[in-house]
Amino acid sequence: MVLIAALAALAACGGGDEETTSTTTSAESADTESTTTADASGCSEVEEVEVLAFAQHKDQEFVAADYETNPPAGGDHNPEPLQGGNFYAEPPRLGEAVHLLEHGAVIGWTNDLAPEEQEAIEEAFNEVFQEGYYQLAAVENPELEVPFALSAWGALQTCESAAPEAIAPFVEEWYASPKSSESALACDGTARRLPPC
């Protein structure tokens, strides 16, 4: 079941609530920062992930272990991006989803949500879509270690339950992420209405 919705990444469009920052180091020695941008129950602070502004195109099947975070927030990916503006009930190629992130998108990742939880996530994405954020996607990901997560190029937020209230603040902060060299594609005029990127 594929539904139109559209999710993408908005950091260039800016603005944020109170922020607290701390630096940590992952097992793979990548620096990350945690930034509070959403007050969603059951969700982590937004983690800023150190990524290159661009990555390599590789024609291979990617799995969660190929990336520093799960779900991915950047890295090498397939040559073709995932089609934004959709809900994917079946997992698409992970490398195509990561390529969409490079284009400034925000992706909501789900793992076996109850039908009413999935519907709430889709409704929240549709509300953001109606505000002009068209590079969005919701993707089923059985490799996800939590029920719900949001990612953009260089940013990740994980949730211990479905958290539709976390979507709008994350999109407002990370749509068209300034951490990607290709994020302007989220604001390139192909949509009918665009956020102020």
Predicted region positions:
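N-terminal export and membrane-targeting signals
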Residues: 1-3
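C-terminal motif of bacterial Sec signal peptides marking the signal peptidase cleavage site
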Residues: 8-12
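Bacterial signal peptide processing site
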Residues: 13-17
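Extracellular mucin-like PTS domains
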Residues: 19-38
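Surface-exposed, low-hydrophobicity interaction/linker segments
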Residues: 37-98, 118
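Pocket-edge structural micro-motifs
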Residues: 69-71, 110, 140, 152
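Mid-length scaffold segments of soluble, non-membrane domains
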Residues: 88-132
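Helix-rich interaction surfaces within compact, conserved domain-sized segments
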Residues: 127-197
